[in-house]
Amino acid sequence: MSGGGTETPVACEAAQGGGGKKRDSLGTAGAAHLIIKDLGEIHSRLLDHRPVTQGEIRYFVKEFEEKRGLRELRVLENLKNMIQETNERMLPKCRETMQGGLEETLQRLQAATDSIHRLQQREQERKKVINDHLTASEKQRMLQWEEFLRGQPQRRAEVDAEHRKAMERLREQYAAMEKDLAKFSTF
């Protein structure tokens, strides 16, 4: 199968076993070598497809690049047309729409900002009035408390004096009652 005519008779001679002992051992080794060589060739022809696949790959790459090149050219042309259309038609429309919407949005935002600013001023004024009122009330209460504390010793002295007078009257009353009782106990 290797393509040479001498290989087959050698293999046959080895299979027939013709010849001397020395020749048999040499023939068997040579025949085995030839058989291995034939098996290698069979293997490469049946199972090794590198040359065929390389040719197919080259063909596929060539076809792919040709078709791909045309397809990419069409895609790039379409993209160019879309970009031109966008620049000429869509972009000005978008700018106009954006500017119109942006102006309206800015006006609303300014109105909302002014409204919030007024609300904050009112709230600050209200807090200031409340704080001023609280501060004035606190000062007034502090003055009242100080006046109350200043008048406290005098009131205490008055209460103590009244208490002493009441105690003195009670003593006199009890003393008078004791005298009256002493008069009645003699009976």
Swiss-Prot record:
GO terms for biological process: anterograde axonal transport; anterograde synaptic vesicle transport; developmental pigmentation; endosome to melanosome transport; melanosome transport; neuron projection development; otolith morphogenesis; positive regulation of pigment cell differentiation. One of its GO terms (cellular component) is transport vesicle. InterPro entries: Bloc1s5. The modification N-acetylserine is found at residue 2. Residues 1-27 are annotated as: Disordered. Pfam families: Muted. Keywords: Acetylation. It comes from the Eukaryota. The keyword Acetylation applies. Component of the BLOC-1 complex, a complex that is required for normal biogenesis of lysosome-related organelles (LRO), such as platelet dense granules and melanosomes. In concert with the AP-3 complex, the BLOC-1 complex is required to target membrane protein cargos into vesicles assembled at cell bodies for delivery into neurites and nerve terminals. The BLOC-1 complex, in association with SNARE proteins, is also proposed to be involved in neurite extension. Plays a role in intracellular vesicle trafficking. Belongs to the BLOC1S5 family. Octamer composed of one copy each BLOC1S1, BLOC1S2, BLOC1S3, BLOC1S4, BLOC1S5, BLOC1S6, DTNBP1/BLOC1S7 and SNAPIN/BLOC1S8. The BLOC-1 complex associates with the AP-3 protein complex and membrane protein cargos. Interacts with BLOC1S4, BLOC1S6, DTNBP1/BLOC1S7 and PI4K2A. Component of the biogenesis of lysosome-related organelles complex 1 (BLOC-1) composed of BLOC1S1, BLOC1S2, BLOC1S3, BLOC1S4, BLOC1S5, BLOC1S6, DTNBP1/BLOC1S7 and SNAPIN/BLOC1S8. This is Biogenesis of lysosome-related organelles complex 1 subunit 5. It comes from Rattus norvegicus (Rat). The gene is Bloc1s5.
